[in-house]
C-alpha cells in the first residue's frame, strides 16, 4: 500500500517491483487538507487486507510537507503482520527518530537535507530479522562471503564498487557540529524550526487567502499552502511554474511551487532551517501578495 502523498520516485519503484512480481499496488487517497492525524490512520488501516505484504509510509511527505503519524502507523501496521518501509528522506534533522523504539522493518533517510551533509549521504536501516532478505542493487564481493547476517549486510552494501565514502563519513561530525550551534542542541533546533515554519505558513496562507492544510501538530520544518486559482497557472509546455520563476527571477526567492496531480492542487511549500529568520517569510508573503 502507498499513500498518494508519497514521493513519486519511491512510488515508481514500488510500481516497478509490483509489476515484475505480479503484485498489486493499493494507492490510498489522502486529502490535501487534513483536519487531524486520525483521518490518516483510519484511511490507511482501512486499506489493509489479509493479502497486504508491505506499506510505504513517510515520516514527512516530500511533496506536501505533512508530518505523518508514522510512529502510530508503524505500530498498528506491523502488529497486523505487515512490514513497513519507512521513507525518512525528510526525517533526520526535523523529527526525532528512535530506531530501537520504532522497531520498523525497513527505513531509509537522507542526511544531506536537514543535517547539512554532502549530497549522497544517507542511511539504510534493516531490522535484524530482515537483513538476510535484502540485497544491494549492485551485486559485488560480499555476496559470496561466509559471514553472519550483520557482517554480510555491511560487506554487501558497503562495497558495491569503486566509490567515494566521504559523504557518509561526514555524517557524525555534521550531527555534532550543527547540534552545537545552539545551547539546547537538536531538540532546540527541531522546535525552533517548527515554530518558524508555522509562522511562515501563517503569513503564506494569509497572502494567498488559503487555509492551513494540516493542524500545527503535523508541521515540522516543512509546510505547504494551496495557491488560489486566481493566480496564473503553469502552461503545460513550460518546465517550471510561472510563480516559481517569478519569485526566483524578480525576488531572489527559491521555493518549490507545484501542481500535484493526485489532488489536482497547486501549492507552494516552504522550509525552515537554522539559518532562516522571520524576516525572510515576511518578504515571501509580500512577494506573494504582489503576485496576486
Q: Could you describe each region identified by the protein language model?
A:
Residues 1-292:
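Pyridoxal 5′-phosphate
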Amino acid at each position: 500500500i502507498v499513500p498518494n502523498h508519497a514521493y513519486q520516485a519511491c512510488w515508481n519503484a514500488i510500481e516497478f517491483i509490483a509489476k515484475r512480481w505480479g503484485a498489486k499496488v493499493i494507492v490510498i487517497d489522502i486529502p490535501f487538507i487534513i483536519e487531524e492525524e486520525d483521518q490518516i490512520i483510519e484511511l490507511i488501516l482501512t486499506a489493509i487486507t489479509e493479502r497486504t505484504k508491505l506499506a510505504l509510509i513517510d515520516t514527512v511527505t516530500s511533496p506536501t510537507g505533512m508530518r505523518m503519524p508514522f510512529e502510530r502507523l508503524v505500530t498498528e501496521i506491523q502488529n497486523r503482520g505487515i512490514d513497513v518501509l519507512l521513507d525518512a528522506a525528510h526525517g533526520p534533522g526535523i523529527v526525532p527518530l528512535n530506531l530501537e523504539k520504532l522497531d520498523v522493518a525497513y527505513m531509509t533517510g537522507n542526511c544531506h537535507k536537514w543535517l547539512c551533509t554532502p549530497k549522497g549521504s544517507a542511511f539504510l536501516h534493516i531490522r535484524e530479522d530482515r537483513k538476510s532478505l535484502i540485497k544491494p542493487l549492485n551485486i559485488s564481493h560480499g555476496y559470496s562471503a561466509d559471514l553472519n547476517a550483520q557482517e554480510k549486510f555491511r560487506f554487501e552494501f558497503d562495497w558495491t564498487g569503486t566509490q567515494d565514502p566521504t559523504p557518509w563519513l561526514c555524517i557524525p561530525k555534521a550531527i555534532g557540529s550543527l547540534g552545537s550551534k545552539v545551547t539546547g542542541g537538536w531538540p532546540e533546533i527541531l522546535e525552533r524550526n517548527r515554530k518558524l515554519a508555522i509562522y511562515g505558513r501563517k503569513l503564506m496562507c494569509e497572502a494567498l487567502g488559503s487555509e492551513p492544510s494540516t493542524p500545527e501538530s503535523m508541521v515540522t520544518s516543512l509546510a505547504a499552502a494551496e495557491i488560489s486559482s486566481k493566480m496564473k497557472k503553469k502552461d503545460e509546455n513550460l518546465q517550471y511554474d510561472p510563480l516559481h520563476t517569478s519569485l526566483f527571477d524578480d525576488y531572489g526567492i527559491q521555493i518549490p511551487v507545484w501542481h500535484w496531480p493526485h489532488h489536482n492542487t497547486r501549492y507552494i511549500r516552504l522550509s525552515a532551517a537554522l539559518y532562516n529568520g522571520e524576516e525572510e517569510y515576511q518578504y515571501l508573503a509580500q512577494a506573494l501578495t504582489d503576485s496576486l
